[in-house]
Amino acid sequence: MRRLSGVLLACAMFVVPAFSHGHGDLFAQTAPNKTTFTGDIVVMAFAINPDKTADYEKVIASLKDALSKSEAPEAKQQLAGWKIIKNAMPNPDGSIVYIHIISPVVKNADYSIMNNIYAAVKDPAEQKAVFDMYRGAMKAPLFVIQGPMVADLSK
């Protein structure tokens, strides 16, 4: 009997809150995670599905558009220092690597691709369409490297 009451109590603890009024609102109201960097320079790499490179480039165009239209002063600085390279040769699995180079890093600025797009695109259906395109294109994030400038050979 003690075992049964324990199981029922556990079920009530997990099931009842899931069906309570307003439960979904809790997740809708949470702020998205920011992607910030502390280094002077950032290098990020993403493997993109070979048949979805056009979709990924549309997402990047949306990012550029969002940052261009942003009234946040750091957005213009982000645009000036954010470059993206597409590897000319596919990986052995066929994926295409896109390298993001950010120099200089704008301290405390949000570098999340989707957060920046969502700040400009307010229509939930359009946000979902861009997210689905981004998720469908992304095979895997490969790495993020950030750190201080060690040497500038141009000087």
Model regions: which residues?
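Short amphipathic alpha-helical segments
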Residues: 52-77
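Sec-dependent signal peptide cleavage junction
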Residues: 20-32, 152
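Bacterial N-terminal signal peptides
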Residues: 7-25
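Short amphipathic alpha-helices in soluble, non-transmembrane regions
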Residues: 58-62, 112-121
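Short, glycine- and small/hydrophobic-rich beta-strand elements in well-ordered beta-sheets
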Residues: 27-39, 68-98, 107
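Positively charged n-region of N-terminal signal peptides that target proteins for export
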Residues: 1-4
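C-terminal partner/receptor-binding element of secreted or periplasmic proteins
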Residues: 118-155
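Acidic/histidine-rich, surface-exposed loop or edge segments in extracytoplasmic proteins
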Residues: 37-50
